[in-house]
Amino acid sequence: MSSPSSLDFYDAELRAHHEHLRAAYGIGPGDEVLDIGCGTGLTTREAARGAAPGRVVGVDVSQRMLERARQLTAAEGLGNVRYELGDAQVHRFEPASFDVAISRFGTMFFSDPNAAFANIAGALRPEGRLVLLVWQRLEHNHWVQAIDAALGDAAQSPPPGADPFSLGDAQATARILERAGFDAPRFQDVHEPVLYGHDLDAALAIVRGFQSTSAALANLNDDEAAGAVERLRSTLAGHDTNERGVALDSRSWLITATRRRDDA
């Protein structure tokens, strides 16, 4: 999936979750903001509008996503945004240069979360704010379980370092943040649907385009693949809400924390 419309689908898929993140930003004029795992830049551009004349830096590991982000940012005429290709775990941020660090599902894939959040903490000024959305544990996310069940034995576990639910344990994640230099991490339960398309055909095309789904189907013979696709269609049909399209249940954490003062 590489066209602009397919890249932008991720924003539509998560629009219900995004409203919770937006309400927690607290970004004001003059703030310096870091957007971690910024993707195509929806959150970055939104932060830029609230922070102006402050600057916003969006970081992502995908050059393709960043190219789309730059296109959309230029189209909106936002001059206070910069995008950087890099992994926030090891990226060389200017120390103590940001007031707020935000991320919408962009912090779950670090190979070393302790090092990553320590690096992010170092980029924040003392008492700077961290605002994240991360998925809760797999058993609370039907949007993945339903697809895996339809794929059956062909469903594949994520490779090491690619687990979207790696921060789903609130107690373990709180300890990571505290070790990294953050105080008072708070976890708000966000219970919203993942939106997979305006109708059944669109939803099936989207799900078949996922890397994990296409890889699973590629491991099956033609008859097995056809059966798996039919099970996917049936599963998605059972979640067609008409008003919002195909919607599957999910749970995530809205996490807020504050960078510890150096003299604390």
Describe the function of each predicted region.
Residues 1-9, 184-244:
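C-terminal helical/coil "lid" or tail adjacent to the Rossmann-like core of SAM-dependent
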Residues 32-36, 40-91, 115:
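Class I SAM-dependent methyltransferase SAM/SAH-binding core
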Residues 51, 110-111, 124-126:
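Helix-to-beta-strand junctions that scaffold the AdoMet/dcAdoMet cofactor pocket
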